[in-house]
Amino acid sequence: MITPFDLHGALNLDAARSLARWLQDQGNDGLVIAGTTGEAPVLTDDERLSLFAAVIEAVTIPVIAGTGTNDTAHSVHLTKEAAALGAAGVLAVCPYYNRPSQAGIEGHMRAMAAASDLPVMVYDIPVRSGRKISSALLLKLAREVSNVVALKDAAGNPGETAVVIANAPDGFEVYSGDDGLTLPLLASGIVGTVGVATHWTAPDHQEMFGLWDAGDTAGARRVNARIDRKS
């Protein structure tokens, strides 16, 4: 979900509540806040936590709070705060700018997961973070850390996504994090999308997923083409 600001650059919580309710009414099954689209790196802690509280209060669908930063201790703190506010889960982005090793990424993700009992969605977006989370590490976290339960995949490599899905433990869910790859990734077994276009195409996405699940791949392609025209 985008983060609304007013003309003076201040966080607009009334607009955030209204937008969250509208997105729910449009058919979104959950909301991810303070992610990439929500401009998380520009938010102060007070703004981020106020946003969490406002959106959680405004809707009845699950709210996934973006608590990952490039600072492990800071990410742990935000995760604990999100849990106290009632978030349904947290989004843990690969630490950006620092370009950590795979061992460093592992330590960061384990620390975030240990900070609360909330489900953790790992967020792999190398074009912005500067570091790809390896498929081997994604699978290791999925197998060894009980509350690492999902992946938002914005890595742009459908072949690697297919490897993760094929080898992940039962119950581990993979979501598209790239609007342009959502339909192709359905063929590999993703369960949904954490999108940008879903701000205005949620009914279309619901229709596309329904057609795909029903075996109507041609129909799903037609709806995807409609989504592309709107994006």
Task: Write out the residue ranges for each language-model feature.
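Catalytic cores of alpha/beta
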Residues: 71-84, 161-164, 180-188
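Catalytic beta/alpha-barrel core
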Residues: 90-91, 146-156, 172-178
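Short acidic/histidine-rich active-site segments
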Residues: 176-178, 191-197
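Active-site beta->alpha loop and helix N-cap motifs at the rims of alpha/beta catalytic domains
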Residues: 3-132, 140, 148
